Regions:
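Short alpha-helical transmembrane segments in multi-pass integral membrane proteins
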Residues: 1-22, 80-147, 191-247, 303-368, ...
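N-terminal transmembrane alpha-helices
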Residues: 9-46, 60-75, 79, 104-108, ...
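Transmembrane helical elements of multi-pass membrane transporters/channels
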Residues: 20-39, 141, 152, 175, ...
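Transmembrane alpha-helix boundary and packing residues in multipass membrane permease domains
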Residues: 25, 29, 41, 78, ...
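Residue-level hotspots within the lipid-embedded alpha helices of multi-pass solute transporters
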Residues: 29-33, 67, 107, 111, ...
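Helix-terminus/linker motif at the lipid-water interface of multi-pass membrane proteins
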Residues: 34-53, 122-129, 185-194, 250, ...
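Small-residue-rich hydrophobic transmembrane alpha-helices
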Residues: 52-112, 149-168, 277-335, 339, ...
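Short runs within selected transmembrane alpha-helices of multi-pass transporters and secretion channels
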Residues: 70-73, 141-160, 168-176, 197-213, ...
């Protein structure tokens, strides 16, 4: 039985398929933290700290809002991959149109309501008047990227669903490189300060959208999909399923945001050195996320395609191949953090007190790659299978476990936070794993998609 389970590992085609989808997404993800570093470096060289504080405050508001709407990418990937695998050209086209309409609708609502939303959130902030002023300045310009940013979710998801990971990679790279270049031009060259940083991000998002639309149009013609005009009267077909899937993934995202936000805010109550140490360790946790996300995206595309084709053998090969490479990456990260964790911390901060605090909590980071691997992979499986309800329910359980563990071990202070985060990652994997194994053994996983 064991030999039959792992037999796909002897097939070079399985490894090529996994790596062809995963590596471009990992490479594009690497540009995301690079963009943040360049933004901070450019604004940080201006003559007052409140410029950097304002950009940080405004960009956080935008980032959290857009991140919560990231369900548009996940749902589009799963549904497009299933349509692609089932060779249903009309449904493949409808998925793109429905996703686009939903993205533009959310963008319109955000543009209409952004002023009262900003007034409310900035009113809650304890930041200085200068930081609030520049934060609002950044936000009021950056908000106009909403149509492009949300459309980019749909474009990325649809292209990935059609088993094309190179186009999404270049979309992300073009967006981020454009942003970096315009940051340098507008802020350092023309002296536009905060307005320049915001405008650079807006133009970058639209440049990525234009490139993505060109890639979609190319695929549309190659696959001979029906023209959008012919489908205008059919956009309601399957819309109920699309809306329900987006609702469930949105609720899942809210729970995820609640856990990570609590980690940040609660850590601040344990002192400046502790919150700084957590920030250093969380930056490494983001590296784990960016690396594993590439394999999760590959899993989404391959699982969705296999389900669309009703091909259990192809599905098994996708699962085993992605598991193998994910395990290899996680073992490598565990070894890296275990053997060179102190040196990595020293590269991030030269403050001795922060280094000492980070070293205290480093063991939690060492176990995190293997603890979190399962939730990333299973997220990919369930996104590809468009099982939003299962993802939502398992996330409810995992988030509850996060808060229960923290309050049960609250006397451990920051160790309790890291224990809660580790249990959160484990419970996400365990919850989805139990559901998956039950449905797989009952032979209902494919049937219920």
């Amino acid at each position: 039985v064991t030999n039959s389970i792992f037999s796909p590992l002897s097939n070079p085609q399985v490894h090529r398929q996994v790596l062809a989808l995963a590596i471009p997404m990992v490479l594009s993800n690497i540009t995301v933290p690079l963009l943040g570093l360049v933004d901070a470096a450019v604004i940080g060289h201006l003559d007052h700290a409140w410029y950097l504080g304002g950009v940080a405050l405004g960009s956080t508001m935008i980032s959290v809002t857009f991140w919560l709407l990231g369900f548009l990418r996940m749902s589009t990937t799963g549904l497009a991959a299933q349509s692609y695998g089932g060779e249903d050209r009309k449904q493949l086209a409808l998925v793109f149109m429905q996703g686009s309409l939903m993205a533009l609708l959310f963008a319109l609502v955000f543009l209409i309501a952004h002023t009262p939303i900003a007034d409310l959130i900035f009113g809650w902030s304890d930041a200085s008047a200068e930081v609030k002023h520049y934060g609002m300045q950044y936000f009021s310009i950056r908000v106009w990227s909403a149509p492009a940013a949300l459309m980019n979710f749909v474009l990325l998801g649809w292209l990935l669903g059609t088993q094309n990971s190179k186009a999404p990679m270049w979309m992300v790279i073009i967006t981020n490189v454009t942003n970096i270049a315009l940051d340098l031009l507008f802020v350092m060259g023309l002296g536009w300060k905060v307005e320049g940083a915001a405008l650079a991000s807006v133009i970058a998002d639209y440049s990525g959208m234009v490139f993505g639309l060109m890639c979609v149009w190319k695929t549309w013609r190659e696959r001979q999909l029906p023209s959008p005009q012919k489908l205008l009267t059919s956009t309601h077909h399957g819309l109920g399923r699309f809306v329900k899937l987006n609702r469930d993934i949105f609720l899942r995202s809210l729970c995820l945001q609640a856990a990570f936000s609590f980690m940040t805010f609660q850590g601040a109550s344990f002192g400046d050195e502790v919150v700084a140490a957590n920030a250093v360790l969380m930056s490494f946790l983001m590296i784990i996320s960016y690396g594993m996300d590439g394999f999760a995206y590959a899993m989404e595309a391959m699982v969705g395609k296999a389900i669309g084709a009703k091909d259990r053998q192809q599905l098994s090969a996708s699962l085993v191949g992605t598991f193998f490479w994910s395990l290899a990456i996680c073992l490598g990260l565990t070894a890296l953090f275990g053997l060179a964790g102190s040196q990595l911390i020293a590269m991030i901060t030269s403050i001795e007190a922060v280094q000492q605090q980070a070293a205290v909590y480093l063991p939690w980071l060492v176990v995190m790659p293997l603890a979190s691997m399962w939730c990333f992979l299973l997220d990919g499986i369930f996104v590809g299978a468009t099982k939003g309800k299962d993802m939502r329910n398992s996330m409810f359980v995992a988030t509850s476990s996060f808060f229960v563990v923290f309050y049960l071990f609250a006397e451990w202070e920051n160790h309790a936070l890291w224990f809660a985060m580790t249990s959160f990652m484990l419970m996400r994997g365990i919850g989805l794993g139990v559901i998956f194994l039950y449905q797989w053994r009952k032979d209902t996983f494919l049937a219920q998609c």
